[in-house]
Amino acid sequence: MERVVVGLSGGVDSSVAAALLHRQGYAVEGLTLWLMKGKGQCCSEGMVDAAGICEQMGVPYHVVDSRDRFQEAIVDYVVQGYEAGITPLPCSQCNRAVKFGPMLDYAKTELKADAIATGHYARLRQNPETGRTELLRAVDRNKDQTYFLYDLPQSVLQSVKFPLGELTKPETRQIAAELGLRTAEKPESQDLCLAEVHGSMRAFLDRYIESREGEIVDQSGRVLGKHTGIHHYTIGQRKGLGIAHSEPLYVIAIDPIQNRVVVGDRHSAAQSECTVSRVNWVSIAQPDAPIQAAVQVRYRSAPVPCTVIPLAGDRARILFADPQFSITPGQAAVWYDGDRLLGGGLIDRVERTTEPV
C-alpha cells in the first residue's frame, strides 16, 4: 500500500485532500510544519484542527518544528527585500525552501513514505515523451495556485499529489460536510500568513523595520510630499500617497539609497519588458530559442501574451506584447501555454516603454 504524508494546515482544503486519499486506499499520515515563533501563533489552532482530522480518520499525525527555517528563509527574506526597496513574494519561496522540499525529505527519510500531498489547487500530468512531470492549472481557475508553485523542482513534483486539482472550492466544502470533517465550515484563510498573523502586511513590516520618513518625488526629482518609510510602498501603488495632484500618480520606483519614493503618471508606470532571475523551467526543459507564452506577473493578474527569451545563468528576458503596468521587482513572472505552466522566475529589472499607452 502506497504511503502518503499529507501536509495539514488545519484548513478545509488540506483536510479534504487527506480524506480523499484515505478513502482511495492510501496509507495516509498527517504532518504539520510548525512555522511561527512565539506563543499562540497561527500554527497552534491549525495544529489542533489537523490533529483532530487525523483522529477522525484514525491515522498518525506528526508535527515538525520548522520555525528556524521559516524565520531565515521567509521572515528575514521578506524584511531584507522591503528594506532594499523590492516587494518580495514569500509564498513561492516558502513552498520550495520550507514546505515541499523539507517535507518530502522528512516523509521519505523519517516516515518511509512514497509521496507527499497538499491541499493546493493544481494538477499534475506525466509526459511520457519528455519524462517530465507537468504542472497544470486547477479546474477551479479562481482558486488556481500554480503561480505559487512555479519554483518546485522536478524531484519534488514527481513525488507529490494534489487531490483537489479537479475540484472546485464549493465541491471541496461539500465533501468536507458529507464526511463530517470538523473543518468543513472553517473560514477561508488569507493567502499571506504573515499578514494574517500580524493583522496586516504593514503591521508585520513595522515590527521589523524602523520607519524613516523621506521624500516622495517625481521623475525630475521635484519633491511632492513625504513618505512614512519605503517599506510602506510598492510599485504601482496609487492610494495612500497623500499627494494632491492634477492627475493620478503611481509609485514607479523605490530608491532605498536616497530613501525616496518616485511617482509618475500612468504612462510612466508602464513597462515593455523585464528580466527575471532564478528561473525554474517546469513542464519543459529550457528551450534553445525564444518561445511565445502567456505571462502572469501577479497572483490575481490576467495572463498576457509575451515572448520569453532564455538567458544564461538561470535568467530570462520577457517582452510583453503590450506594455504592462505595475511590474514589480521581487514578484514572480510565471509563463504558461494554456493551462500548462512552462516556467517562472523573480522579476529583477524592468524597462519602461517609450510608446504611448
Curated annotation (Swiss-Prot):
Active site residues according to the UniProt entry: C94 (nucleophile), C193 (cysteine persulfide intermediate)
Assigned GO CC terms: cytoplasm
Record-listed ATP binding positions: G7, L8, S9, G10, G11, V12, D13, S14, L33, G119
Region (Interaction with tRNA) residue spans: 143-145, 298-299
Catalytic activity: S-sulfanyl-L-cysteinyl-[protein] + uridine(34) in tRNA + AH2 + ATP = 2-thiouridine(34) in tRNA + L-cysteinyl-[protein] + A + AMP + diphosphate + H(+)
Pfam families: tRNA_Me_trans, tRNA_Me_trans_C, tRNA_Me_trans_M
Location, primary (coarse class): cytoplasm
GO terms under biological process: tRNA wobble position uridine thiolation
Subcellular location(s) per record: Cytoplasm
Record-linked InterPro entries: MnmA-like, MnmA-like_C, MnmA-like_central, MnmA-like_central_sf, Rossmann-like_a/b/a_fold
Function: Catalyzes the 2-thiolation of uridine at the wobble position (U34) of tRNA, leading to the formation of s(2)U34.
Protein name: tRNA-specific 2-thiouridylase MnmA
Organism listed in the record: Synechococcus elongatus (strain ATCC 33912 / PCC 7942 / FACHB-805)
